[in-house]
Amino acid sequence: MAATAAYLPLRAQAQVGLAPLRPSGSAAAGARLPGRTARRRLAARGGPEAAGIRAEAVPGGGGVARRAAMVPPYNVLITGSTKGIGYALAKEFLKAGDNVVICSRSAERVESAVTDLKKEFGEQHVWGIVCDVREGKDVKALVDFARDKMKYIDIWINNAGSNAYSYKPLVETSDEALMEVITTNTLGLMICCREAINMMRNQPRGGHIFNIDGAGSDGRPTPRFAAYGATKRSVVHLTKSLQAELQMNEVNNVMVHNLSPGMVTTDLLMSGATTKQAKFFINILAEPANVVADYLVPNIRAIPTNQSMKPTYIRFLTGLKAYSRIFSRIAFGARRNKYVAED
């Protein structure tokens, strides 16, 4: 969070679960966003392009001689997507006309989420399955399920994460809570990336993987949830390492990116709204999941639309936006008590 050091009080961002903020002129490295009319026309085309495939020769590719360029509608898989930002992302992709597979550890939440989404977007565009990302067999089954329903996965978003809903010093944290956080956020992420790459590298159209960051991913301390911050620091490192491995192995049709939703008013964030300082920054900087997803999804979709295979870090809460909100609060009292009572 290099851009926030000048204005955030000591440890403030860690206390509220704030992800890294950096000024950015364009969240998707200048990617152009396709208009809705253009997307509808692409989706309505016949032949191979209706399925999102347009043949394009590329060199190398780790044994893949040709890469089929992606066009909308896209096939999307999101882990941890029955509530919060994951569910909101699923809705936005469906609004754009894409096909989506959601998953969760809870069979009840999967059933409920799929039922609600099918009512709104139709039976043929969304599916769900129970999956514990900590279990390799579950993630392999998830891939098989997605392949059966959609044939390809164009966009895989690793959103599943946990802080065990525990905000306390490490010395007071139980073994069970530590295992919950580390196995979900680190082991689970690695398993998902492994299976996503193995599938996508053998697809004619390749694919894009997005790893969601969180507080601690920039290396700043996260007191009271040190384990969570340590796992999120590893997200950025893992993404860079996978990018390097793909390049070394001449896999030209798969790319791994980072995705930063900033502060989202989910159960995960709000469970930490226990101090005056935490409440202050949540009110100033946080946004509901649907607002964040409405911004992120077009920027995510712009990457395959522009046939880009460059690594991208998409951020919702930039440094400039944070500066502006903090100034408005100090000068005009804006957003006081917006989500939680401060007085």
Swiss-Prot record:
EC number: 1.1.1.294
Location(s) in or outside the cell: Plastid, Chloroplast thylakoid membrane
InterPro entries hit by this protein: Chl_b_Red, NAD(P)-bd_dom_sf, Sc_DH/Rdtase_CS, SDR_fam
Record's GO cellular component terms: chloroplast thylakoid membrane
Catalytic reaction list: 7(1)-hydroxychlorophyllide a + NAD(+) = chlorophyllide b + NADH + H(+); 7(1)-hydroxychlorophyllide a + NADP(+) = chlorophyllide b + NADPH + H(+)
Domain of life of the organism encoding this protein: Eukaryota
Location of the active site: 228
UniProt transit peptide range: 1-54
Molecular function GO labels: chlorophyll(ide) b reductase activity
Membrane topology: Peripheral membrane protein
Disruption phenotype: Stay-green phenotype during senescence. Grana stacks fused into large stable stacks during semescence.
Top enzyme class: oxidoreductase
Induction, per UniProt: Up-regulated by dark treatment.
Gene3D superfamilies: NAD(P)-binding Rossmann-like Domain
GO term, biological process aspect, one: PSII associated light-harvesting complex II catabolic process
Keyword line: Chlorophyll catabolism, Chloroplast, Membrane, NAD, Oxidoreductase, Plastid, Thylakoid, Transit peptide
Claim: Transmembrane helix is one of the keywords in the record: no
Quaternary structure, from the entry: Interacts with NCY1 to form a complex that acts as a chlorophyll b reductase.
Annotated family: Belongs to the short-chain dehydrogenases/reductases (SDR) family.
Function of the molecule: Required for chlorophyll b degradation.
Note: Chlorophyll b reductase activity detected in vitro with a recombinant protein produced in a heterologous system.
Protein name in UniProt: Chlorophyll(ide) b reductase NOL, chloroplastic
Record organism: Oryza sativa subsp. japonica (Rice)
Name of the encoding gene: NOL
